[in-house]
Protein backbone atom coordinates (compact mmCIF):
# COMPACT_ATOMS: atom_id res chain seq x y z
CA UNK A 1 0.00 0.00 0.00
CA UNK A 2 1.37 3.39 -0.96
CA UNK A 3 1.78 5.86 1.86
CA UNK A 4 2.71 9.45 2.59
CA UNK A 5 3.96 10.57 5.99
CA UNK A 6 3.74 8.11 8.86
CA UNK A 7 2.52 9.31 12.26
CA UNK A 8 3.09 7.78 15.70
CA UNK A 9 0.88 8.95 18.54
CA UNK A 10 3.20 8.24 21.44
CA UNK A 11 4.30 5.39 23.68
CA UNK A 12 7.14 4.49 21.38
CA UNK A 13 8.78 2.71 24.32
CA UNK A 14 7.69 1.44 27.71
CA UNK A 15 6.43 -2.14 27.33
CA UNK A 16 8.57 -4.06 24.83
CA UNK A 17 12.05 -5.55 25.08
CA UNK A 18 13.67 -3.63 22.20
CA UNK A 19 13.26 0.07 22.98
CA UNK A 20 16.44 1.28 21.26
CA UNK A 21 15.65 -0.69 18.13
CA UNK A 22 12.17 0.81 17.99
CA UNK A 23 13.46 4.36 18.41
CA UNK A 24 16.07 3.73 15.73
CA UNK A 25 13.40 2.37 13.35
CA UNK A 26 11.19 5.41 13.91
CA UNK A 27 14.08 7.84 13.40
CA UNK A 28 15.39 6.13 10.28
CA UNK A 29 12.00 6.30 8.59
CA UNK A 30 11.26 9.88 9.55
CA UNK A 31 8.09 8.98 11.46
CA UNK A 32 6.31 12.07 12.80
CA UNK A 33 5.84 11.48 16.54
CA UNK A 34 4.42 12.96 19.71
CA UNK A 35 5.31 12.07 23.28
CA UNK A 36 3.29 9.43 25.15
CA UNK A 37 2.85 8.95 28.87
CA UNK A 38 5.10 5.87 28.90
CA UNK A 39 7.77 7.75 26.97
CA UNK A 40 7.59 10.48 29.60
CA UNK A 41 7.81 7.96 32.45
CA UNK A 42 10.91 6.42 30.91
CA UNK A 43 12.51 9.86 30.65
CA UNK A 44 11.63 11.05 34.15
CA UNK A 45 11.43 7.87 36.20
CA UNK A 46 8.11 9.07 37.63
CA UNK A 47 5.90 5.97 37.69
CA UNK A 48 3.85 6.48 40.86
CA UNK A 49 0.56 6.54 38.99
CA UNK A 50 1.30 3.37 36.92
CA UNK A 51 0.24 -0.10 37.97
CA UNK A 52 3.19 -2.12 39.25
CA UNK A 53 3.68 -4.08 36.02
CA UNK A 54 3.76 -0.98 33.82
CA UNK A 55 6.00 0.76 36.36
CA UNK A 56 8.46 -2.12 36.34
CA UNK A 57 8.58 -2.12 32.53
CA UNK A 58 9.07 1.65 32.36
CA UNK A 59 11.92 1.57 34.88
CA UNK A 60 13.57 -1.34 33.06
CA UNK A 61 13.35 0.64 29.83
CA UNK A 62 14.82 3.67 31.57
CA UNK A 63 17.82 1.58 32.67
CA UNK A 64 18.61 0.10 29.26
CA UNK A 65 17.73 3.00 26.94
CA UNK A 66 20.66 4.68 25.20
CA UNK A 67 21.41 8.37 25.56
CA UNK A 68 20.72 8.83 21.87
CA UNK A 69 17.24 7.36 22.23
CA UNK A 70 16.61 9.45 25.34
CA UNK A 71 17.54 12.58 23.43
CA UNK A 72 15.13 11.70 20.65
CA UNK A 73 12.24 11.08 23.04
CA UNK A 74 13.08 14.15 25.10
CA UNK A 75 12.74 16.36 22.04
CA UNK A 76 9.24 15.16 21.16
CA UNK A 77 6.35 17.60 21.64
CA UNK A 78 3.23 16.63 23.57
CA UNK A 79 1.09 17.83 20.66
CA UNK A 80 1.76 18.90 17.12
CA UNK A 81 -0.19 19.89 14.04
CA UNK A 82 0.86 18.18 10.84
CA UNK A 83 -0.24 19.53 7.48
CA UNK A 84 -0.83 17.00 4.71
CA UNK A 85 -2.08 18.08 1.29
CA UNK A 86 -3.56 21.24 2.77
CA UNK A 87 -5.33 19.50 5.66
CA UNK A 88 -4.32 20.08 9.27
CA UNK A 89 -4.16 17.10 11.63
CA UNK A 90 -3.72 17.63 15.36
CA UNK A 91 -1.74 14.83 16.99
CA UNK A 92 -1.82 13.99 20.69
CA UNK A 93 -1.34 10.86 22.74
CA UNK A 94 -4.16 11.43 25.23
CA UNK A 95 -6.33 14.40 24.31
CA UNK A 96 -5.72 17.91 22.97
CA UNK A 97 -6.44 19.36 26.42
CA UNK A 98 -4.43 16.80 28.42
CA UNK A 99 -2.00 15.24 25.96
CA UNK A 100 -0.40 12.68 28.26
CA UNK A 101 -3.13 11.64 30.68
CA UNK A 102 -6.70 11.91 29.41
CA UNK A 103 -8.43 8.94 27.81
CA UNK A 104 -10.74 9.70 24.89
CA UNK A 105 -12.75 6.61 24.00
CA UNK A 106 -15.31 5.87 21.26
CA UNK A 107 -18.23 6.73 23.55
CA UNK A 108 -17.08 10.35 23.90
CA UNK A 109 -19.90 12.77 23.09
CA UNK A 110 -19.74 14.20 19.59
CA UNK A 111 -19.89 17.73 21.01
CA UNK A 112 -16.43 17.25 22.52
CA UNK A 113 -15.04 15.92 19.25
CA UNK A 114 -16.42 18.96 17.43
CA UNK A 115 -14.99 21.23 20.14
CA UNK A 116 -11.51 19.79 19.58
CA UNK A 117 -11.77 20.41 15.85
CA UNK A 118 -13.14 23.94 16.02
CA UNK A 119 -11.00 25.13 18.94
CA UNK A 120 -7.77 24.10 17.28
CA UNK A 121 -8.95 24.95 13.75
CA UNK A 122 -7.94 21.59 12.32
CA UNK A 123 -9.48 19.12 9.91
CA UNK A 124 -8.74 16.04 11.99
CA UNK A 125 -7.55 14.97 15.43
CA UNK A 126 -5.47 11.80 15.83
CA UNK A 127 -5.26 10.31 19.33
CA UNK A 128 -3.74 7.25 21.03
CA UNK A 129 -3.47 6.16 24.69
CA UNK A 130 -6.57 3.91 24.87
CA UNK A 131 -5.21 1.20 22.52
CA UNK A 132 -8.78 1.03 21.16
CA UNK A 133 -9.28 1.99 17.50
CA UNK A 134 -12.20 4.09 16.31
CA UNK A 135 -13.15 6.70 13.74
CA UNK A 136 -15.65 9.52 14.27
CA UNK A 137 -16.47 11.84 11.39
CA UNK A 138 -18.85 14.69 10.64
CA UNK A 139 -19.01 17.73 8.40
CA UNK A 140 -16.70 19.48 10.87
CA UNK A 141 -13.90 16.92 10.51
CA UNK A 142 -12.67 13.61 11.87
CA UNK A 143 -11.37 12.31 15.20
CA UNK A 144 -9.71 8.92 15.16
CA UNK A 145 -7.56 6.51 17.10
CA UNK A 146 -5.56 3.94 15.13
CA UNK A 147 -5.32 1.55 18.07
CA UNK A 148 -2.01 -0.03 19.00
CA UNK A 149 0.64 -1.98 17.12
CA UNK A 150 1.44 -3.64 20.45
CA UNK A 151 -0.49 -4.29 23.68
CA UNK A 152 -3.97 -4.06 22.08
CA UNK A 153 -6.98 -3.71 24.37
CA UNK A 154 -9.72 -5.00 22.10
CA UNK A 155 -9.54 -8.75 22.60
CA UNK A 156 -7.90 -9.12 19.18
CA UNK A 157 -4.14 -9.75 19.38
CA UNK A 158 -3.35 -8.40 15.93
CA UNK A 159 -1.54 -5.09 15.46
CA UNK A 160 -3.87 -2.19 14.70
CA UNK A 161 -3.17 0.86 12.56
CA UNK A 162 -5.00 3.40 10.43
CA UNK A 163 -4.58 4.82 6.96
CA UNK A 164 -5.98 8.14 5.82
CA UNK A 165 -6.83 9.14 2.28
CA UNK A 166 -7.27 12.73 1.18
CA UNK A 167 -9.44 13.51 -1.81
CA UNK A 168 -10.92 16.88 -2.68
CA UNK A 169 -9.92 18.37 0.69
CA UNK A 170 -11.77 15.53 2.42
CA UNK A 171 -10.14 13.06 4.79
CA UNK A 172 -11.31 9.45 5.04
CA UNK A 173 -9.80 7.12 7.62
CA UNK A 174 -9.71 3.32 7.50
CA UNK A 175 -8.71 0.99 10.33
CA UNK A 176 -6.65 -2.13 9.73
CA UNK A 177 -5.54 -5.22 11.64
CA UNK A 178 -2.50 -7.32 10.79
CA UNK A 179 -0.88 -10.33 12.47
CA UNK A 180 2.68 -10.10 13.75
CA UNK A 181 5.20 -12.43 15.37
CA UNK A 182 3.88 -12.47 18.92
CA UNK A 183 6.00 -15.49 19.87
CA UNK A 184 9.24 -13.61 19.22
CA UNK A 185 8.04 -10.47 21.00
CA UNK A 186 6.93 -12.51 24.01
CA UNK A 187 10.17 -14.49 24.12
CA UNK A 188 12.27 -11.33 24.12
CA UNK A 189 10.17 -9.88 26.93
CA UNK A 190 10.66 -13.06 28.96
CA UNK A 191 14.41 -12.97 28.37
CA UNK A 192 14.50 -9.34 29.53
CA UNK A 193 12.75 -10.30 32.76
CA UNK A 194 9.71 -8.12 32.13
CA UNK A 195 6.52 -8.95 34.06
CA UNK A 196 4.84 -12.10 32.67
CA UNK A 197 1.45 -10.42 32.43
CA UNK A 198 2.84 -8.01 29.83
CA UNK A 199 3.86 -10.71 27.37
CA UNK A 200 1.01 -13.10 28.19
CA UNK A 201 -1.58 -10.46 27.33
CA UNK A 202 -0.12 -10.10 23.83
CA UNK A 203 -1.74 -13.42 22.94
CA UNK A 204 -5.15 -12.29 24.18
CA UNK A 205 -5.17 -8.70 23.00
CA UNK A 206 -6.17 -7.30 26.38
Whereabouts are the PLM-identified features?
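Active-site-proximal segments of metal-dependent phosphoesterases and phosphodiesterases across multiple
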Residues: 49-56, 85-120, 152
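Short acidic-hydrophobic surface loop/beta-edge motif
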Residues: 78-86, 136-138
Amino acid sequence: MGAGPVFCLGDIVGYGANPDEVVSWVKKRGVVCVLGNHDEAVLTGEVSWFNRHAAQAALWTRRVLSQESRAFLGALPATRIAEVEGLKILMAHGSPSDPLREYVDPSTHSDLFEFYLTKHKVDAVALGHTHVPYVWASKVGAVFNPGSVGQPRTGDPRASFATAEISGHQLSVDLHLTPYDIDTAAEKMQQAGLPPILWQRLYRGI
